[in-house]
Amino acid sequence: MTQQIQVDLGERSYPIYIGQSLMSDSETLSRYLLKKRILIVTNETVAPLYLKQIQDTMASFGEVSSVILPDGEQFKDLTHLDSIFTALLQRNYARDSVLVALGGGVIGDMTGFAAACYQRGVDFIQIPTTLLSQVDSSVGGKTAVNHPLGKNMIGAFYQPQIVIIDTECLQTLPAREFAAGMAEVIKYGIMWDAEFFQWLENNVQALKSLDTQALVYAISRCCEIKADVVSQDETEQGVRALLNLGHTFGHAIEAEMGYGNWLHGEAVAAGTVLAAQTAKSMGLIDESIVRRIVQLFHAFDLPITAPESMDFDSFIKHMRRDKKVLGGQIRLVLPTAIGRADVFSQVPESTLEQVICCA
């Protein structure tokens, strides 16, 4: 059964469809693609699995071309973004074109940013193929590429026309990538929904065995939460910042260790544990909450400690470049209970040093 969730942003509202076999559902896509020139952006891993299927689905609507990029966070940069622009220009794509992101978070972020920039904005569609992109990066309009000095530092807020989440894609997802996606799923429970967190604790095996009903529920609940948050705060001036739980520490891990060596979800898991330990040190939560968070990440085979090679100085140099920094102050999203979080801008560096050094 297909679930539909609406992201309510006035004239820029759009639906999210979640279910099975949706990549073959031409009816759902028809209103967004009819008489359009279509460029599918994908990568070398996804193309052999799903490119022909989606090309066949879209062929009746108009001209369909594709560009295939290398696979990996290390390729999410201006050089490979330019490959998308080159493909569009060489084929004389105009403003009535549609870009289709077929892949994980890297492809979605790059395609969305290309759509935002090309001829000052063309339509794009998200078809996320990884769990992480299905529950997080495909929804909400954040688009970006990385810079050697920081993650997602060059980008824009630009909403898709529609998000198509086909759960059958998860059958071909490597176990490590699935676990990385679960880090973002768990994040939603920690920062927003205590009942969902408890449901995750009770359904570890169902999710790890890719039970369809469990997957659809988990993905739908995450998308509901994100749609609610984004509808309240599209450009991250307030409540949307809570979605960055674990990300300030996590982005530091990714940047220091080299993009792609730690998957984004792996870094978020370790970063969320550090955030929970920081919250405990500040008296915001007790040890039992930290323990539940650690146990749930561990149940999905996610890292619960930072890399041994990273010391306080390694973290802090990257955290000072974080996009949430205001007035020179590092701002951290910290849990205040299971199901609640807040943004804190007065976290003593001595507390951070103690947490990082003891991790």
UniProtKB/Swiss-Prot annotation:
Cofactor note: Binds 1 divalent metal cation per subunit. Can use either Co(2+) or Zn(2+).
Pathway(s): Metabolic intermediate biosynthesis; chorismate biosynthesis; chorismate from D-erythrose 4-phosphate and phosphoenolpyruvate: step 2/7
Required co-factors: Co(2+); Zn(2+); NAD(+)
Annotated positions binding Zn(2+): 184, 247, 264
GO MF annotations, alphabetized: 3-dehydroquinate synthase activity; metal ion binding; nucleotide binding
GO cellular component, one term: cytoplasm
Catalysed reactions, semicolon-separated: 7-phospho-2-dehydro-3-deoxy-D-arabino-heptonate = 3-dehydroquinate + phosphate
Similarity comment: Belongs to the sugar phosphate cyclases superfamily. Dehydroquinate synthase family.
Annotated organism of origin: Shewanella sp. (strain MR-4)
Amino acids binding NAD(+): 71-76, 105-109, 129-130, 142, 151, 169-172
UniProt-listed GO biological process terms: amino acid biosynthetic process; aromatic amino acid family biosynthetic process; chorismate biosynthetic process
SUPFAM superfamilies recorded: Dehydroquinate synthase-like
HAMAP family xrefs: DHQ_synthase
EC number: 4.2.3.4
Source organism superkingdom: Bacteria
Its biological purpose: Catalyzes the conversion of 3-deoxy-D-arabino-heptulosonate 7-phosphate (DAHP) to dehydroquinate (DHQ).
Designated name of the protein: 3-dehydroquinate synthase
Pfam families: DHQ_synthase, DHQS_C
Keywords, in A-Z order: Amino-acid biosynthesis, Aromatic amino acid biosynthesis, Cobalt, Cytoplasm, Lyase, Metal-binding, NAD, Nucleotide-binding, Zinc
UniProt-annotated location(s): Cytoplasm
